[in-house]
Design a protein with these regions (language model features):
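Conserved N-terminal structural module of periplasmic/extracytoplasmic solute-binding proteins
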Residues: 3-19, 24-110, 130, 177, ...
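Short, solvent-exposed loop/beta-turn-alpha elements that line the ligand-binding surface or hinge
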Residues: 124-138, 142, 220-243, 293-310, ...
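Immediate post-signal peptide segment of exported/extracytoplasmic ligand-binding proteins
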Residues: 33-43, 64-66, 147-149, 171, ...
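C-terminal capping/gating helix-and-loop segments adjacent to ligand/active sites or protein-protein/ligand interfaces
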Residues: 228-230, 323, 362-365, 379-441
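Hinge/lid segment of periplasmic solute-binding proteins
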Residues: 104-161, 176, 185, 212, ...
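Extracytoplasmic/periplasmic substrate-recognition and gating elements
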Residues: 61, 66, 94, 172-173, ...
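Extracytoplasmic/periplasmic solute-binding protein
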Residues: 146-155, 161, 185-232, 276
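Glycine-centered hinge/linker elements that transmit conformational signals in sensory
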Residues: 188-190, 230-261, 315
Length: 463
């Protein structure tokens, strides 16, 4: 009997079926396989770095834990975004924008439109996102709109018109915390006469010098003229500009000798350590003091305690005004824009703001967020201050100016403080107002919506 056996017919058929299945599977994988999942990583451009980093670090860690998306923070240090804004504009002009970036609500965003090849069409309209998370139901969300559209989702509310005072320095020299401009000038000159730096502002990162002039101007001119300055519709010969400049120079004369070399964190440090009496800044300084100087107790001017070291107050003459600085997120269009939108959505949500604002020194834009989440008495006080404020304006130094106008005034204010060249400053202000109005008119935008323009003011070009 032969040892060879023939292969049975069922086996042949079965093998053929298997072969066909394998071929079909290979063809399916080659031509019909599911698309590769997009990379779970985005870049977020920001100027929060160094001593101001804890808040954004906490937010990013929270977002990554929730979504699995890695966020690379490309930080360009410099207070108020002095350097970051122009780095972002350069990326946009080169056609390589990040997936998301930090921006202030207001005309600052329009500067990015103007720098982009297709203007606002290169950015994601976030109006629907704002509706979904409820931020457009808030007062802050509404005023962040540009002619009824939201391109920046707000993540917090800062107050710019604050003065920080070292209680020990004032007590040792028999000075009561000043509540009026006249009292501030008298106190500053008295301290200067004793060889004590009174007003400690910083020249290295430019912004706190213009910031001081701005608060003086707000106190002298009032909120309506301040808003007209923002739109460039204020007469450059208005007497309030000259009066604010005169007061500014009186206070600038009491700066420490090395003020041009200081940045804003160093200026805060001087006042905290008693090497100066006053520093005018926003409540991001509250976050800095809270995260860096653990043993330093802050208190509002209305409830000074014996153990208080730093008194925080509205800048004299601006008590009823909340000078807003609103940090926000913008999203350029691109292959990963959906991830950028998701990041902006989380950051601007109640959940994101509860993570970010406590260490930042700011407060949430949502009025129903309980004040007890804030670690400092100043933030709890600011919640009430905002609720009670009669007027709201947008800070000129922090978002209410187009970038080119902002740069003119930043450098002009430092030159004014150094050389007291008032004619040059008035010329700079005149040019700045003219350019500010021209850029607003060129774009046709205004803050708010047709139904609710910011502060009830519709500029002449409003469509």
């Amino acid at each position: 009997m032969s040892l060879r056996r023939g292969v049975s017919r069922p086996v042949l058929i079965g093998g053929a079926v298997v072969l066909v299945i394998l071929i079909l599977a290979a063809l399916y994988l080659a031509f019909f396989r599911a698309p590769t999942a997009p990379p779970k990583e985005i870049t977020f451009y920001t100027w929060w770095a160094g001593l101001e980093e804890p808040a954004i670090k906490a937010l990013v860690e929270s977002y990554t834990a929730k979504t699995g998306v890695k966020v690379t923070r490309s930080a360009v240090p410099g207070g108020a975004g002095v350097n970051a804004k122009f780095a972002i504009i350069a990326l946009i002009m080169a056609g390589k924008p990040p997936e998301a970036f930090q921006v202030h609500c207001g005309p600052e965003m329009i500067s990015y439109f103007l720098a982009s090849p297709n203007k606002e069409a290169d950015f994601v309209d976030l109006t629907q996102v704002g509706k979904e998370i409820g931020v457009l139901e808030t007062a802050v969300g509404k005023v962040c709109m540009l002619s009824g559209k939201l391109y920046t989702t707000p993540v917090n509310l800062h107050r710019a018109n604050l003065i920080f005072m070292n209680k020990g320095v004032l007590d040792a020299n028999g000075i009561k915390p000043p509540r009026t401009l006249d009292e501030l000038i008298v106190a500053s000159k008295a301290l200067q006469a004793k060889g004590i730096p009174a007003m400690v502002q910083a020249g290295a990162d430019l912004f706190t010098v213009l910031h001081l002039w701005e608060q003086i101007f707000l106190a002298v001119a009032g909120p309506q003229k301040f808003i007209e300055f923002m739109y460039g519709t204020l007469d450059p010969g208005d007497p309030s500009i000259k009066r604010a400049t005169e007061i500014f120079l009186e206070l600038a004369a009491t700066f420490p000798p090395d003020w041009p070399a200081l940045d804003w964190t160093a200026a805060v440090d001087r006042v905290v350590r008693g090497l100066g009496a006053f520093h005018v800044d926003g409540d991001w300084a509250v976050g800095l003091i809270y995260t860096t100087y653990k043993d330093v107790e802050m208190c509002p001017i209305d409830s000074i305690t014996p153990t208080c070291k730093i008194i925080v107050a509205p800048f004299p003459g601006t008590e009823e005004v909340y000078n807003m600085v609103v940090d926000a997120v913008a999203v350029p269009k691109g292959p990963l824009q959906d991830l950028g939108v998701d990041f902006a959505k989380y950051f601007s949500s109640r959940e994101g703001q509860k993570v970010f604002n406590p260490p930042k020194g700011s407060i949430s834009v949502y009025p129903d967020v309980a004040p007890d989440i804030y670690p400092t008495v100043i933030q709890k006080w600011e919640v009430e201050q905002y609720r009670k404020s009669r007027y709201q304006v947008f800070s000129l130094t922090h978002g209410a100016l187009f970038s080119d106008v902002w740069q003119k005034l930043l450098t002009g204010a430092v030159i004014l403080a150094q050389y007291k060249a008032t004619d040059s400053w008035y010329s700079t202000v005149k040019d700045a107002l003219s350019l500010q109005r021209k850029l607003w008119e060129q774009t046709g935008y205004y803050l708010g919506s047709p139904e609710a323009p910011f502060a009830g003011y519709k500029p002449p070009w409003a469509r």
